[in-house]
Amino acid sequence: MTIYRFFKRSAFTLAYIYRRFHEEGCAYRATALAYTTLLALVPLTIVAFTLLSFVPAFQGVGVRLQNLIWENFVPTSAGMVAAYLSQLTQNVTGLSIINIFFLGIVALLLMYNINRAFVAIWHTEHHFRLSLHFLIYFMVLLLSPFLLGAVMLLGTFLVQSPLVTDLIGWPYLGKGLLFVLPYVLIFITFTLFNWVLPSAKVKLSHAVIGGLVTTVLFELAKFAFTVYLKFFPTYRVIYGALSVIPIFLVWLYVSWTIILLGAVVSNVIACGIPEKYK
């Protein structure tokens, strides 16, 4: 009887999560975020590279940070986008302050749309003016490259320390750490999404569960996406050399769908299921 009740409750929970995902229009929001991300990706990268270039200690950190993101958050099949993005960011030295300012506006709009999607899922309202929100987004955009750059430098320092070098040198422990570390990075990223972006007081435990669900689904999607493109190269046959654009756009849509689904999971765990749906 206990097992039956467990499966029954799990079925109701999954059904309600699907219902909430549909009612909040997450599929449509994922579509909008995918297009916005595609448009804002280059501006975000250029702004980050420009800010990091002002600090001599961060020379070369931008490229390493970019490679870290591409290696962990994009399937191998869509990795050609990284090469195109690297070529585009090489033109950053030829941009004026005004051009960089407008690129920053595009990046701010992406941050605003992401925040609005999480706010809609959690049914929270902003209590500040729109101008204040964009000021907050601007501060985040301004400080994030330096914080991430500092984390990269700290990580490099730790990896080169004698203790970590000895641990990595161990036959099984070293390989285990190198295998687990990318998943931990992805898990922390998605947990922070669910903890910070809803503009509400979210318990860390609820954000952790949502981050864990998102991480598992994200990794499964990466594997399935790579397998699909390998054995069913439809986009490459149709679009040829231009296939990198629709392939990457589809991956962005899948990614945002999973991220928003994780946000719904966090919200359902935090707020529970209403009696009328039980």
From Swiss-Prot:
Its main location: membrane. This is UPF0761 membrane protein CBU_1578. It holds the Pfam family Virul_fac_BrkB. The chain crosses the membrane at residues 38-58, 68-88, 92-112, 134-154, 177-197, 207-227, 244-264. It comes from the Bacteria. The keyword Membrane applies. GO terms for cellular component: plasma membrane. Belongs to the UPF0761 family. PANTHER family: INNER MEMBRANE PROTEIN YHJD, UPF0761 MEMBRANE PROTEIN YIHY. It is a multi-pass membrane protein. Keywords: Cell inner membrane, Cell membrane, Membrane, Transmembrane, Transmembrane helix. The keyword Membrane applies. It comes from Coxiella burnetii (strain RSA 493 / Nine Mile phase I). InterPro entries: UPF0761_bac, Virul_fac_BrkB. Signal peptide: none annotated. It is found in: Cell inner membrane.
